[in-house]
Amino acid sequence: LYDPSQYELTRNPEAIRKQMTLIDQIHERGAKVIMSSHMSGDFRTAEQVLEHLRQQSARGADILKIVTRANTEDELAEVIRTTMILNKELDKPFVHLCNGSCSRLHRFIGPKLGSAIAFAVNDYNKPSLLYGQPTIRSLKTVIEAIPWHVDDVQVK
């Protein structure tokens, strides 16, 4: 079932079959499945992320999750564009996050762009906590302060 692979998404047919069988068994018990890939060290284009999440969906996952990287302003702009494309193209809930030196803004606005889940910490009083995640209080403040959601945009 476990098949370590680049970008945390196996292409091994036997491993894929086992994943799909397990997902079916989980669904039979009435539960939902989130499939998650972390490639925090790599920048991925919108097209690469969309294809990756479509593969997760094809395996039966109910919620699709991916974490990529944003270390430059251009990468951040592409991450924002990617989240909006995912919101338009996918028919399942998704979580699109990024890590990196330019990732913090996306952590705050991801839910406004269509990401189903945001991650936050209570506070930064422990040295082990990553500062990439906002605090619950600051995330809530930002989300409540922006009276906009991508689903409210009417394309002409």
Label each region the model flagged.
Residues Y2-K156:
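Catalytic alpha/beta core domains of metabolic enzymes, predominantly
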